[in-house]
């Protein structure tokens, strides 16, 4: 595993400039090397017995090349040609450091690393309002409604929601949307709009475009149906 600049190892605080690992990961993919996964500022490679010295040398050479491109602040069209071509209007004239700075600032503004920690600490877990099975049955019966992410706060999730990374369910059916989970998905929504081409994989939520902006939507239990299910102690 390698770490990229951006977080002070002494105190865990964001530095003024950083290199989000997803940018390095995309550069490596552009050049035939596929990392196993990457997080905010770390990237993981899996080595198998089949790997030979030539492949390791290729990886090292690409890392050195990326570092030189970063130092020279190379044009983004040279570093990530595929993403640049797909979103040329958005990234016209951009350099590598400029992209790194914008993405790093987004992470720092939302304190995304702290949100990731809180989502998996017991004291920050979403409050449970329904049995997951009951919530799933309500979903299958259509006793749900699709709402925008900001409107989901305080509502009961009808589906489990999973962002990759970290690739773990952050809210499960029957839990209340809110807290660190809602703020984390809100940060992802901003990133999807601000930095096209770097959208994370999301499951259990839905991306819809309205007036030129992509919005995150999710299914929640209809209030009266949820109350009825709880009061009756319905078993299916």
Spans of model-derived segments:
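Non-catalytic terminal extensions of PLP-dependent enzymes
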Residues: 1-236
